[in-house]
UniProtKB/Swiss-Prot annotation:
NCBIfam families: S15_bact. The keyword Secreted does not apply. It comes from Borreliella afzelii (strain PKo) (Borrelia afzelii). Part of the 30S ribosomal subunit. Forms a bridge to the 50S subunit in the 70S ribosome, contacting the 23S rRNA. This is Small ribosomal subunit protein uS15.
Amino acid sequence: MIDKKQKQKIVSEFGKNEGDTGSVGVQIALITGRIKYLTEHLKINKKDHSSKRGLLKLVGQRRSLLQYYQKKDLEAYRALISKLGLRK
């Protein structure tokens, strides 16, 4: 999992201020970090089906947040996906 220091780094990078953990951009960035971690975990542990299910759940959650963010603020959405390196 992502440790506390990595989460704080993501929050400070994508948030409006240091304690901004609830904004959509920060949530998407945190979920992306967890997805990257689980992807690497599943490359090593191919038969870990519960982690695979959790990964698919996170991907769906991120997708819905991205759709919401695209409708809410298109320019910030484009900046976020380019910063995170997501395809869209």
